[in-house]
């Protein structure tokens, strides 16, 4: 979405776009134990005379917003910065407490929160159960969240001007404090679209 004038905005007037980090729009959601957070974003373009539709090569009939997971796999002998998060197959997240280079073999990942794991010249700390994209639901209305999904179909053609409200509900099932704020794992992406002047 970084190259489009159509973006996710924090306000209906489209004055505050979601911040972009590493080419991906980021919305920080932090949980204080098991809870759900509901909110609304706005998808649109404030640039006059723009139109969005799907690319001719797409098999989709409509633009779609899709909840997706970033690749957070551990990689051997890789340089990492402090704050980087990995998500191995054990269902937990680990944040690098210092920069360095990972080791040649996969470390033994502790499932105890706040436990440190040495790995090459870096150190990982267990920060809790991993987020799962299935815990994020999208809908075109707040009432639609009860049957929301991780994919939302938008109109076939979207004109700039009035934004489309995109409601979201994020559910945290873990009792611990959780945040992937330094290195987001879950994101919203768009399918193959094309923007043009009209």
Predicted features by range, described:
Residues 30-35, 77-83, 119, 157-163:
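Solvent-exposed, conformationally flexible loop/turn segments
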Residues 1-3, 197-198:
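Sec-dependent, cleavable N-terminal signal peptides
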Residues 69-130:
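Tryptophan-rich substrate-binding surfaces of secreted polymer-degrading and adhesive proteins
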Residues 55-61, 183-188:
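Short, surface-exposed ligand- or partner-binding patches at beta-edge/loop junctions that are enriched
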Residues 20-23, 33-40, 162-166, 177-188:
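Short, solvent-exposed loop/turn segments enriched in Ser/Thr/Gly
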Residues 9-18, 60-69, 129-179, 196-198:
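Signature of Gram-negative chaperone-usher
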Residues 4-50, 56-60, 68-71:
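Beta-sheet-dominated interaction scaffolds and their linkers
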Residues 45-47, 170-174, 188-196:
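Beta-strand elements of well-folded, non-transmembrane domains
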